[in-house]
């Protein structure tokens, strides 16, 4: 009986050690793919998820490229803490807008840039609308209102199929979709600068 108890205790300890090691590894993996300031995925997380999109040949997704307007101005004028707050406000707006899109993902691409992927692409309109709405709501809650604006560009996988030289094989890479979304974000930024003056 003593031998059985000893063996069972040894087994329990071994299982516990394995579980603890697994949890530690999982925690380290989460840290490796998380942006410390925003809690969103970081660039490595985005690259990993985008690689999966390419490998699985997912064909119904949209890329939302987001850039914070005049972050450098905010840093220089109000200090880097204010700039960090601005980044966090945008990240919160993105998180809230992405709720319910369990197949999609979002992350901070670095600096003032964020990338969201909407799956299916039909969700993209509501997501971009909610990002702007969430930002406006956060801004109005600040006293005084905190100046925050973003430029947004959108591109979908499907719009490439007719124009790519590899369209017969249906080969489109996420980097192509991101590049187009980035270009459209810049167009949005230029259009905003022609409008009424604000934090653009």
Kindly give the residue locations of the regions a language model identified.
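Conserved long alpha-helical elements within nucleotide-processing catalytic cores of c-di-GMP signaling
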Residues: 29-33, 39-62, 69-96, 107-111, ...
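Generic non-transmembrane alpha-helical segments
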Residues: 93-101, 130, 134-141
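Sensory-module boundary signal marking interfaces of small helical input modules
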Residues: 18-21, 71, 196
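Catalytic-core segments of nucleotide cyclases and related cyclic-nucleotide turnover enzymes
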Residues: 76, 80, 129-132, 157-200
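Beta-strand residues that line the small-molecule/cofactor-binding core
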Residues: 45, 147-152
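Interfacial "cap-and-anchor" motif at the non-cytosolic start of specific transmembrane alpha-helices
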Residues: 1-24
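A structural signal for short, well-ordered beta-strand segments
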Residues: 63, 114, 150-154
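A short pre-motif secondary-structure segment
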Residues: 103-108, 146
